[in-house]
């Protein structure tokens, strides 16, 4: 019965997202909340300048409303769901402030790196202090085995790294129409299956609400995008998926299921290190999706390829996390 409820959860979130987006997009246009495009980016992206951004608000509202309704209905509104909503709201708020400064204050870089990091740290610390011993414990498990390693307070550092790193990695992936919406839906879908296998139905409800919300948003975010989620959406999704992995004790498996996000981040790190040490670039441009664009791939081809890779990694992650 609850498994059917998960499909209903995704369906409800999808419908709310699809219903809200056509109302919210004109509102963003009226406020002139348009995306600015970097001059150093691919030339084909210049035509996207002015496309409404901060659409992540639609994802958040759709996900939050659906999660609360379904979690209450199935009596699963516990510490885990509360923590997930806290992290999603906190990182979404940081993203909102970042977007707001960009589009209203006309400061292209938004929040400073220091301001953003402080905000991310505060949310991550709150997550750890509230959840430790209640929603999760301080050990990690080797995926596909019963082997566990107690980390003690070193787990605190891991939580900070995962939440901050996860939010930034997902944020880097949001560079092409529909890219993040699709890969996020796939990753959260994979974790929902693992959550069901662990009988963590509150986490599963949250994951399926996210799946429905981002797929509904994808209807308007697919190429050519009518709206972007902005940092409001990408930082929230990144923090949320890291929190889900922590609550499911699948910290290491996040590297596989979130492999697309990891690859995007590594491409930036490699590019920076290479340029600073040798003066040469490994990629034509980073993050990785822009490299393939500059190699002559169409935007849609890059997106579908990354979705496909994300799907294969998700299947591998489910196999390791459930059947091994």
From Swiss-Prot:
MF terms from GO for this chain are:
metal ion binding; phospho-N-acetylmuramoyl-pentapeptide-transferase activity; UDP-N-acetylmuramoyl-L-alanyl-D-glutamyl-meso-2,6-diaminopimelyl-D-alanyl-D-alanine:undecaprenyl-phosphate transferase activity
Q: What is its EC number?
A: 2.7.8.13
Please name the top-level EC class of this enzyme: transferase
* Protein's pathway: Cell wall biogenesis; peptidoglycan biosynthesis
One GO biological process term is: cell division
**Cofactor(s) of this protein:** Mg(2+)
User: Any idea where this protein resides?
Assistant: Cell membrane
Assigned GO CC terms = plasma membrane
A Pfam family in this protein?
A: MraY_sig1
Q: Which UniProt keywords apply?
A: Cell cycle, Cell division, Cell membrane, Cell shape, Cell wall biogenesis/degradation, Magnesium, Membrane, Metal-binding, Peptidoglycan synthesis, Transferase, Transmembrane, Transmembrane helix
Q: Which reaction does it catalyse?
A: UDP-N-acetyl-alpha-D-muramoyl-L-alanyl-gamma-D-glutamyl-meso-2,6-diaminopimeloyl-D-alanyl-D-alanine + di-trans,octa-cis-undecaprenyl phosphate = di-trans,octa-cis-undecaprenyl diphospho-N-acetyl-alpha-D-muramoyl-L-alanyl-D-glutamyl-meso-2,6-diaminopimeloyl-D-alanyl-D-alanine + UMP
Q: What membrane topology does the UniProt entry give?
A: Multi-pass membrane protein
Q: Where are the transmembrane segments?
A: 5-25, 52-72, 77-97, 122-142, 149-169, 176-196, 201-221, 227-247, 253-273, 302-322
Q: Which domain of life is it from?
A: Bacteria
| InterPro entries associated with the record | Glycosyl_transferase_4 (IPR000715), PNAcMuramoyl-5peptid_Trfase (IPR003524), PNAcMuramoyl-5peptid_Trfase_CS (IPR018480)
Q: Chief location of this protein?
A: membrane
Q: PROSITE patterns in the record, alphabetically?
A: MRAY_2
Function, as annotated, reads: Catalyzes the initial step of the lipid cycle reactions in the biosynthesis of the cell wall peptidoglycan: transfers peptidoglycan precursor phospho-MurNAc-pentapeptide from UDP-MurNAc-pentapeptide onto the lipid carrier undecaprenyl phosphate, yielding undecaprenyl-pyrophosphoryl-MurNAc-pentapeptide, known as lipid I.
Q: Which PANTHER family match?
A: PHOSPHO-N-ACETYLMURAMOYL-PENTAPEPTIDE-TRANSFERASE, PHOSPHO-N-ACETYLMURAMOYL-PENTAPEPTIDE-TRANSFERASE HOMOLOG
Family as reported in the entry's similarity comment: Belongs to the glycosyltransferase 4 family. MraY subfamily.
Protein's name in the database: Phospho-N-acetylmuramoyl-pentapeptide-transferase
Record organism: Bacillus mycoides (strain KBAB4) (Bacillus weihenstephanensis)
Gene designation per UniProt = mraY
């Amino acid at each position: 019965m609850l498994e059917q409820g998960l499909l209903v959860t995704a369906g409800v979130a999808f419908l709310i997202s699809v219903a809200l987006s056509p109302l919210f997009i004109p509102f963003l246009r009226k406020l002139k909340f348009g995306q600015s495009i970097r001059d150093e980016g691919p030339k084909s992206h210049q035509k996207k300048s002015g496309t409404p951004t901060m659409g992540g608000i639609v994802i958040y509202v759709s996900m939050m409303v659906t999660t609360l309704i379904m979690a209450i209905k199935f009596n699963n509104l516990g510490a885990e769901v509360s923590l997930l909503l806290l992290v999603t709201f906190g990182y979404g708020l940081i993203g909102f402030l970042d977007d707001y400064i960009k589009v209203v204050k006309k400061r292209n870089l938004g929040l400073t790196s220091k301001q953003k990091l402080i905000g991310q740290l505060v949310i991550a610390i709150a997550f750890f202090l509230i959840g430790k011993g209640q929603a999760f414990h301080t050990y990690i498990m080797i995926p596909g085995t019963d082997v566990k390693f107690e980390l003690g307070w070193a787990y605190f550092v891991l939580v900070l790294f995962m939440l901050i790193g996860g939010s930034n990695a997902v944020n880097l992936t949001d560079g092409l129409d529909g890219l993040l919406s699709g890969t996020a839906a796939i990753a959260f879908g994979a974790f929902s299956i693992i959550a069901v296998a662990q009988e963590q139905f509150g986490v599963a409800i949250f994951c399926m609400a996210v799946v429905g919300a981002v797929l509904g948003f994808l209807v308007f975010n697919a190429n050519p995008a009518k709206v972007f989620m902005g940092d409001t959406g990408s930082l929230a999704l990144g923090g949320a998926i890291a929190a889900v992995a922590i609550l499911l004790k699948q910290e290491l498996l996040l590297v596989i299921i979130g492999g697309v996000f990891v690859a995007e981040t590594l491409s930036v790190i490699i590019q920076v290190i290479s340029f600073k040490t040798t003066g040469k670039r490994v990629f034509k441009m980073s993050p990785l999706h822009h490299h393939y664009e500059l190699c002559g791939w169409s935007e849609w081809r890059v997106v579908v390829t990354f979705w496909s890779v994300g799907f294969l990694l998700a299947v591998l992650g489910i196999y390791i996390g459930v059947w091994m």
